[in-house]
Curated annotation (Swiss-Prot):
Gene that encodes it: frr
Organism: Bacillus subtilis (strain 168)
Gene Ontology CC annotations of this record: cytoplasm
Phenotype upon loss of function: No sporulation at 37 or 47 degrees Celsius.
Family: Belongs to the RRF family.
Cellular location(s): Cytoplasm
Keyword set includes ATP-binding: no
A molecular function GO annotation: ribosomal large subunit binding
UniProt superkingdom: Bacteria
Gene Ontology terms: biological process: translation; translational termination
Upper lineage: Bacteria, Bacillati, Bacillota, Bacilli, Bacillales
Protein's UniProt name: Ribosome-recycling factor
HAMAP family hit by this protein: RRF
SUPFAM superfamilies for the chain: Ribosome recycling factor, RRF
Length: 185
């Protein structure tokens, strides 16, 4: 029984790390990356539609994104959505496609992005700790119901703590890498 709880705990912690890494992908580090626009939604025929469903997004060079809409009539709406997303990006259109030059990051902007990364890291750690709390609660219920002994409870709780420590250190490692990437000029 306690093995099942540990397996579920590990899966949930993996999901928390994966979600954190997806969040980090949207943080700009000076390079052009299509995932920068993942959170951009466009008002398209009355519905909020993700930009990546309305167009293809390419990276022709290190500091340039090119958006080619499937429907050319949506270009104006796409430009508005990018500006509204407050990513610090300025789209320019030639009627067929939208180009976004990725500006070099200022020192001030780099520091802001590092703060954002740290906030995401803290949220990920909280998610991992919540998984730990839930797992410990499940283990206590198993012990209360007589499915596991007190010794098994203690051993399993220690295993859950080891998992928590492992995933928190993974988050710290990923965070350090991202901070280094952001602060690189």
């Amino acid at each position: 029984m306690s093995k099942e709880v540990l397996t579920q705990t590990k899966e949930k912690m993996e999901k928390a790390i994966a979600a954190y890494q997806r969040e980090l992908a949207t943080v700009r580090a000076g390079r052009a990356n299509p995932s920068l626009l993942d959170k951009v939604t466009v008002e398209y025929y009355g519905a909020q539609t993700p930009l990546n469903q309305l167009s293809s997004i390419n990276v022709p060079e290190a500091r340039m994104l090119v958006i080619t809409p499937y429907d050319k009539t949506a270009i104006g709406d796409i430009e508005k959505a990018i500006l509204k997303a407050d990513l610090g990006l300025t789209p320019t259109s030639d009627g067929n496609m939208i180009r976004i030059a990725i500006p070099a990051l200022t020192e001030e902007r780099r520091k802001e992005l590092v703060k954002v990364v740290k906030k995401y890291a803290e949220e990920a750690k909280v998610a991992v700790r919540n998984v730990r709390r839930d797992a410990n609660d499940d283990l206590k219920k198993l012990e209360k119901n007589g499915d596991i002994t007190e010794d098994e409870l203690r051993a399993s709780t220690e295993d859950v703590q080891k998992l928590t420590d492992e995933y928190v250190s993974k988050i710290d490692s990923v965070t350090k890498d991202k901070e280094k990437e952001i602060m690189e000029v």
